[in-house]
A protein has these predicted regions:
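Loop-to-helix transition at the N-terminal end of transmembrane alpha-helices
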Residues: 30-47, 171-175
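Cytosolic juxtamembrane amphipathic/interface segments immediately preceding
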Residues: 28-33, 121-138, 202-206
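A generic, lipid-embedded transmembrane alpha helix
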Residues: 39-62
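Alpha-helical transmembrane-segment detector that highlights a single hydrophobic TM helix
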Residues: 59-92
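Juxtamembrane inter-helical linkers in multi-pass membrane proteins
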Residues: 103-129, 200-203
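Hydrophobic alpha-helical membrane-embedded segments
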Residues: 81-104, 187
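N-terminal signal-anchor/start-transfer transmembrane helix
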Residues: 7-28
Length: 241
């Protein structure tokens, strides 16, 4: 019993940390990106990661249903990662289509002079008085990695909660709890970022990722302890699991 409780706690902590890392990897441009004056997707960190998390949980829950009992943790977690990656990939791709063919701009970074992946120069394509625009290659790759990290983390939390070998929560409860832990970490990461971020190449990523992961660790441990208490008592926030 103790081994099971510790395993659930560890998986929740790992899932929370991966969720926080995912938010820092996302190319988020916020309101400025809606006017093509900042690099990234024209939305906030929490909204973007919520969409990725829901997609990942949909695919993870579908794959988990293939087993009557004891779903394969790794396969379910990977399925969640793939679902989130696809969601992020399509979102960034369609966003670039609108930027390129709708607004007539070239996706480029406002934080680096040369794309670290393609080695293409960015400066001459950046519109004056903007912080870049669109989703350049390095941001696209960073977003895909963020989708993988967040989807894997969220699905990992879900599968250990729903599996009868571990927490044995109902499907609905496991989904709600996994989503709650994911969003809690996403909100804290969003406050840590404090605006827009382009991805792992952004100086803001290197400067703030350690603080973000530290805060995520604290939150994830707290959430994990609550889950362990729920497992021991058979209740969750006063309700039956």
């Amino acid at each position: 019993m103790i081994e099971t409780l510790l395993l659930v706690l560890v998986c929740i902590i790992i899932g929370g940390l991966l969720s926080s890392l995912a938010v820092h990897l996302m190319p988020v441009g916020g309101a400025p990106a809606a006017m093509a004056t900042a690099t990234g997707i024209a939305t906030g960190c929490v909204m973007l990661m919520t969409g990725a998390a829901v997609t990942g949980l949909f695919t993870a829950s579908t794959v988990a249903s293939f087993w009557v009992t004891k779903p394969n943790v790794i396969l379910v977690a990977l399925s969640g990662a793939v679902g989130s990656m696809l969601m992020m990939g399509f979102t960034m791709f369609v966003g670039n289509l609108i930027y390129i063919f709708g607004a007539g701009i070239v996706p480029c970074s406002g934080r680096v002079a040369v794309d670290p992946i393609t080695k293409d120069s960015q400066t001459e394509y950046k519109t004056p008085r903007t912080d870049g625009h669109g989703v350049p290659t390095v941001s696209f790759v960073s977003g895909i990695l963020g989708g993988f990290s967040g989807g894997f983390g969220g699905a990992l939390i879900y599968v250990v909660l729903v599996s009868d070998s571990y927490a044995d929560f109902s499907v609905a409860t496991a989904g709600i709890v996994a989503m709650g832990i994911f969003i809690a970490n996403a909100i804290i990461a969003a406050y840590n970022i404090g605006g827009t971020i382009e991805g792992f190449h952004d100086p803001k990523f290197k400067a703030r990722i350690r603080t973000g992961l530290t805060c995520s660790l604290i939150v994830s441990v707290l959430c994990g302890v609550i889950i362990v208490i729920a497992m021991l008592t058979g209740t969750l926030a006063g309700g039956v699991m």
